[in-house]
Amino acid sequence: MALCRRISYLYALALLTVYALFLPLGGYERMMEGKYRAFLLLSLGYVLAMTALGAWKAVRWRAPMCLAALAYLALTALSAALSPYGTAVLLGGTRRDGLLTAALYAAVFLLLARHLRPDRRLLYAAAVSAALCDLLVLVQLMGRNPLWLYPTGLNYFDGDVAYSGFYAGAAGNIDFTAFLLALCAAAMAAALVRGWSKWLLAPFALTMWTLWQLRVAAALLGLAVTAVLGLPLLFPRRRRAMWALTLLLTAAAFALIWFFPGDGGTLSELHRLLHGDVDLTFGSSRLLIWRSLLPLITERPLLGGGCGTLYLRDVPPFYWQRGGEITYFAVTSAHNEYLGVLVDQGALALLAFLALLALALWRAYRHAESDRCAVAGAALLCYAVTAFFSVACCITGVYLWLLLAMLAPKEE
């Protein structure tokens, strides 16, 4: 048992450091495939090592969170078995979000939920990783090409001109980089509120500055919502007062959005939406993408099309309008992790997934007196909000299952 705990701890530490900072050869052009191979190496190695040690015998199969994870895996496997796209479900598309990835997520969660004993050192390691990523991003935002991650002669500001999208940091696409930095920022903020080491102020401030410079609306929104909804989590002894303050701040936020039209950007889009002015190009055309997926849901509502098969289905391209030019892009992701599960794995798998997420958040709030639950709960809450606008892949997804495992009941 002690060896299983040690290996689980080392695996979690590797995810927060080695994997988070891993940069594949070939730079951003090879980022997704390189990260996926690193994920397979770490996660398959961990699962096989734990299997050899007989670690599965100790798994609490009847625990509510484990049952939800097993239901999610079983329904995902059933969706894959009945998919009309054959073996394409095993690996999925270019983001490698197929059955193999989903199975590894569930296996890693079940093992970590029983054997991982998280402590402060894991957050400190994540803070160091975030700070190093911050420094890389800030240098890239100066127009430099450190570590030759961009093609020769190009830099960050060539995004959406010489190549599609914007890339920075150790996760590739700035949406992924900002997503991971937001999770670290939420966890560090919770730890600072709980009186952990003050040296966390340095990486926290650096991470917040980097997020502001990247201007990824989904990550900033995730942090803002976490700051409000996380109050009862961070101050459990004043729970009633914190819930009242949360409701007050939520009402104030809605009032601000309702009355303040903004001068462009996300705030203006939210203002127009509240007033019934719906433009499908809002959120980088996310509304257009989500609407285009509705026919796919009605085709296979219960079990979906199979893991990672959205790119094989008949979805109209979405577009961005810049000045007088319109650029079209193929839809290969739902750009919403929950909608992605609904389309690919069906409503039943989505219900199991939401049940697992709800159980974890319920534990975080119920046991908020525990620093472990408060810190992991804040990061999970940030993930749950940001995922509403995110693309599912192993670069970010593995950290969801790590956080879920941290919030699972632990036996001393």
Task: Pin down the residues of each PLM region.
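Alpha-helical transmembrane segments and their immediate interhelical/interface regions
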Residues: 24-40, 86-113, 258-282
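N-terminal hydrophobic segments of proteins, predominantly signal-anchor/transmembrane helices
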Residues: 11-28, 45-106
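Interfacial juxtamembrane loops and adjacent helix segments
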Residues: 145-168, 268-283, 308-343
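Membrane-interface catalytic loops of GT-C/OST-like multi-pass glycosylation enzymes that act
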Residues: 28-33, 90-94, 171-175, 214-222, ...
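N-terminal membrane topogenic signal
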Residues: 1-12
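Aromatic-rich transmembrane-lumenal/periplasmic boundary elements in polytopic membrane proteins
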Residues: 104, 136-152, 259-309
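A conserved mid-to-late transmembrane alpha helix and its immediate loop/hinge
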Residues: 173, 294, 300, 325-362
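Alpha-helical transmembrane segments of multi-pass inner-membrane proteins
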Residues: 10-15, 19-20, 41-50, 73, ...
